[in-house]
């Protein structure tokens, strides 16, 4: 059994919100009641690992063939709490939506259509198989988890965020580059060139970091890492985790998402978007869905999955 997509229209948004928050309330005793910060330490250890599935002579055993990723992340609690920063400060720490999404995508059997080509669904795989795929991440934050975990599976990965975030994002990616275990990372931003002796057993991933301000973005207008994807890939997924947490962010985010989506569609790429939202304020989630449909005419669906419904994370697929 795999996840399924439940399409939205203006008539079923309220029902979805009501059902999702009612379920959350019934699970309240087993769920953290905080706002979703992964940890409040300056140095955070994060393990993205396959589930423990069997017991052998009394010992638990992990599933075979699934690579673990073990991160050491430096975050900035002072940056999160700063009142002098003119930009958003939430990107200075890791939020729990990102590791939750990464574990589900990599290891959950229900997420198989997003990992492998030629499953019995019409959903294109994120991971590169016979086709060249790319991921553009909006609001990457400082952790570098998805650029490495997903970057290890695709041909192009572009992380984007506000200027003040990028140096810390770069630091964490560089500190965890050894977690690239399937592919070889090349990058202009990180100054990593392809080796002269090409290793034919490992494909390259081009991993780039760039500033992208949602308030100013009107679509790719010059030769950038975003336009390079349209020249070299056939499929692109635009990914954003826990970037919708107040009403002010909804329109700039949807405008940026819509510009990127339309650009890649017009360039002939198979284009989809995955937005992860940590369920906090009910009215913010409802406003996001309503504006996505009514103002931007986006074909948005809820990702219905038994693992996700037991968390505070809702995934939306466009």
Curated annotation (Swiss-Prot):
UniProt-listed InterPro entries: Methyltransf_16 (IPR019410), SAM-dependent_MTases_sf (IPR029063)
GO cellular component terms, A-Z: cytosol; protein-containing complex
Keywords: Methyltransferase, S-adenosyl-L-methionine, Transferase
Domain of life, per lineage: Eukaryota
Residue sites binding S-adenosyl-L-methionine per the record: 95, 139-141, 161, 214, 241
Enzyme Commission number(s) of this protein: 2.1.1.-
Single GO term (MF): S-adenosylmethionine-dependent methyltransferase activity
One record GO biological process: methylation
Protein role: S-adenosyl-L-methionine-dependent protein-lysine N-methyltransferase that methylates 60S ribosomal protein L1.
Family in the record: Belongs to the class I-like SAM-binding methyltransferase superfamily. RKM5 family.
Protein name: Ribosomal lysine N-methyltransferase 5
Organism: Zygosaccharomyces rouxii (strain ATCC 2623 / CBS 732 / NBRC 1130 / NCYC 568 / NRRL Y-229)
Gene that this sequence comes from: RKM5
């Amino acid at each position: 059994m795999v996840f399924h997509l439940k399409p939205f229209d203006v008539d079923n948004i309220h029902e979805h919100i009501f059902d999702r928050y009612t379920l959350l309330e019934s699970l309240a005793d087993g769920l953290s009641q905080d706002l979703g910060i992964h940890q409040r330490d300056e140095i955070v250890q994060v393990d993205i690992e396959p589930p423990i599935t069997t017991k052998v002579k009394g010992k638990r055993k992990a599933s075979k063939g699934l690579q673990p990723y073990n991160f050491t992340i430096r975050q900035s609690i002072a940056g999160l709490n700063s009142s002098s920063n003119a930009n958003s400060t939430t990107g200075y720490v890791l939020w729990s939506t990102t590791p939750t999404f990464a574990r589900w995508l990599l290891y959950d059997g229900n997420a198989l259509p997003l990992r492998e080509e030629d499953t019995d669904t019409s959903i294109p795989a994120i991971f590169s198989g016979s086709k060249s795929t790319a991921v553009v991440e909006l609001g990457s934050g400082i952790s570098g988890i998805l650029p490495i975990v997903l970057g290890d599976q695709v041909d192009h990965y572009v992380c984007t965020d506000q200027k003040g975030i990028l140096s810390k994002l770069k630091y964490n990616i560089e500190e965890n580059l050894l977690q690239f275990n399937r592919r070889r990372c090349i990058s202009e931003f990180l100054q990593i060139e392809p080796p002269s002796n090409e290793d034919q057993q490992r494909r390259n991933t081009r991993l780039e970091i760039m500033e992208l301000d949602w308030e100013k973005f009107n679509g790719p207008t010059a030769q950038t890492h975003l336009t390079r994807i349209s020249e070299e890939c056939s499929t692109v997924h635009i990914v954003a985790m826990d970037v919708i947490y107040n009403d002010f962010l909804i329109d700039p985010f949807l405008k940026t998402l819509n510009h990127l989506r339309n650009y890649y569609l017009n360039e002939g790429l198979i284009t989809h978007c995955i937005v992860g939202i940590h369920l906090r304020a009910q009215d913010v989630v409802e406003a996001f869905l309503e504006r996505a449909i009514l103002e931007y005419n986006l074909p948005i669906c809820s990702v219905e999955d038994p693992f996700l419904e037991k968390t505070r994370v809702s995934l939306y697929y466009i």
